[in-house]
Swiss-Prot record:
InterPro entries: Ribosomal_uL22, Ribosomal_uL22_bac/chlpt-type, Ribosomal_uL22_bac/org-type, Ribosomal_uL22_sf
Molecular function per GO: rRNA binding; structural constituent of ribosome
Top-level taxonomy: Bacteria, Pseudomonadati, Pseudomonadota, Betaproteobacteria, Nitrosomonadales
Cross-referenced PANTHER family: CHLOROPLAST 50S RIBOSOMAL PROTEIN L22-RELATED, LARGE RIBOSOMAL SUBUNIT PROTEIN UL22M
Family designation: Belongs to the universal ribosomal protein uL22 family.
UniProt-recorded name of the protein: Large ribosomal subunit protein uL22
Species, as recorded: Nitrosospira multiformis (strain ATCC 25196 / NCIMB 11849 / C 71)
Length: 115
């Protein structure tokens, strides 16, 4: 049994998101929540909320036990970039790129992960 939570269009670069995602991949959800709670990164706050949502989905929709859940998959993919311009000297302009990303997090019980 696996349950998925998806967050799209997050104002975060995918590279910074992957640093946090790699730390919690494969961990039990209790340990992953503790690790994210004490991480100083912006991505940790975002991924922690998404993990709590995935846990709630698993409990409510599937009737899963929290103690049996672990982070089976987490992907951080590139989303569309926001483009802004900054005025420069002599009538020129520079582009400011504000990256976004999509995060997909799947939690599953330990029995389904052994398959």
């Amino acid at each position: 049994m696996e349950t998925t939570a998806v967050l799209r269009g997050v104002r975060l670069s995918e590279q910074k998101g992957r640093l946090v995602a790699d730390q919690i991949r494969g961990l039990p959800v209790e340990r992953a929540l503790n690790l994210l709670a004490f991480s100083p990164k912006k991505a940790a706050v975002i991924i922690r909320k998404l993990l709590e949502s995935a846990i709630a989905n698993a409990e409510h929709n599937e009737g899963a036990d929290i103690d049996e859940l672990k982070v089976s998959r987490i992907y951080v993919d590139r989303g569309p970039s926001l483009m802004r311009t900054s005025a420069r000297a002599k009538g020129r302009g520079n582009r400011i790129v504000k990256p976004t990303c999509h995060i997909l997090l799947t939690v599953g019980d330990k029995a389904s992960n052994k398959k």
